[in-house]
Regions:
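N-terminal first-folded block
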Residues: 1-49
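Generic secondary-structure boundary/loop-capping signal
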Residues: 28-31, 57, 61, 71, ...
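Short beta->alpha connector loops at strand-helix junctions that form conserved
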Residues: 27, 54, 74-76
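Short glycine-/acidic-enriched loop or helix-start segments at secondary-structure transitions
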Residues: 14-15, 61-63, 83
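Glycine-rich loop at the start of a catalytic domain that most often binds anionic cofactors/ligands
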Residues: 64-68
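C-terminal structural segments of small proteins and small subunits
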Residues: 69-109
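Acidic, metal-binding active-site segment of PIN/NYN-like and related structure-specific nucleases
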Residues: 43-63
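Alpha-helix N-cap/helix-start and coil->helix boundary motif
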Residues: 10-11, 57-58, 79
């Protein structure tokens, strides 16, 4: 699948996904300044299938009904906190289907 990382998603996570997915960062596309709705629009238009984000409020800020892109929300943005939960993150990305939403709980500290 074609996976997009938003600005808060640690790039180190990509190495755990690249064997099955193509991963691109929003900043690599020049999308680092886009707000959530516009980022979702651009990502869908470009053919991205999954957005990995650290924005836990995304589902409350955007109407996700009818979206083709799947969204995986990480509970934290710091790699040191995500790393012990990388298996769950990879599983959530692998299980993503068009329009799906998943949140991977990552406790702080």
């Amino acid at each position: 699948m074609l996976v997009l990382f938003d600005n808060g998603t640690p790039r180190t996570l990509a190495r755990y996904l690249i064997d099955r997915h193509t991963v691109t960062e929003a900043r690599a596309r020049g999308w680092e300044e886009l707000e959530n709705g516009e980022l979702l629009n651009q990502a869908e238009a470009a053919g991205f299938e999954v957005l990995v984000t650290t924005d836990k409020n995304l589902r409350y800020q955007q109407n996700l009904t009818g979206r083709r892109i799947a969204i995986v929300v990480l509970g934290q943005g710091r790699w040191t906190l995500i790393q012990p939960h990388v298996t769950q993150v990879v599983a959530a990305v692998n299980a993503a289907t068009p329009g799906s939403f998943a949140e991977v709980e990552i406790p702080y500290g």
